Amino acid sequence: MNVIETRALGKSYGSTRALRDCTLAIPDGHVVALVGPNGAGKSTFLNLAVGLATPSAGEVTVLGGLAAGSLPALDGIAFVAQDTPLFKNLSAADLIHMTRNLNLRFDQGYAEHRLGELGIDLEQKAGKMSGGQQAQLALTLALARRPQLLVLDEPMAMLDPLARHDFMATVMTAVADDGVSVVLSSHVLAELERVADYLVLVSRGRVQVAGEVNDLLATHRVLTGPAAQAGRHLQHWDVVHASCAAPLAEVLVRGYATCEPMPPGWDAHSLTLEELTLAYLREPDAAALPGPARTHSPGTKERTK
């Protein structure tokens, strides 16, 4: 089952195209890192998936084919946004009561127990809580709905490192205990690397990279060798990003197997998710998507083989 699937999805705000020609299938059972620069279309994509916006073109379905925003879809998805929208004048107990009345599957016992573990007073008003406590309260209310899919849009942006760690610990406990699928948008790449097993990179309103992290890392390598020899090799490699400053060239390639045997004086090194992501962000015309292989050299348009 795909928890989110899009076909030629697009969204425009007036003359501004926030998302264009997005075709993507995210399978269930993953913690998905949704990354990209500011204004790339990440929040637009998530808003379309959870039914807070309607497409200008194409379609989006969730949880195995349900129309995004439909009542069955809303019943199976929980969403936490960056600003942790809580009624600041209501206590945690009030918010639990309100959320329970709006959601038939709401697990009040879980919510109260979880907040107790976190040391959050049920009688304290949300507006009097720290940023970390507010984020944990919003996350607890979302998880108590017992969703199949948890969507998180920059929920840790305003949190300190300890609060971010505690927030992600709660998320990963839900993944381990309940099998929740997660789509998490964040700018903190090192943090995502510890938890994500699926990557979706959005750039300039389109999906640039999508796939399981292990597969992406296995098919990409950083090649290093004499800068003077780089030019003769680049045309034969599927190059994502190249830095050829003398004396040593550093080239990130896709389809590493096609580069073997390595030329004399060249070595191949594995890379991290952060290095992979940054390389594609530096080369927005490069892509790594399921389907036909694409070739690209920095400064040129990609082409499909």
Where are each of the predicted segments found?
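Conserved structural motif at the start of ABC-family nucleotide-binding domains
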Residues: I4, L19-D21
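The feature captures the beta-strand-to-loop junction immediately N-terminal to the Walker
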Residues: V35-P37
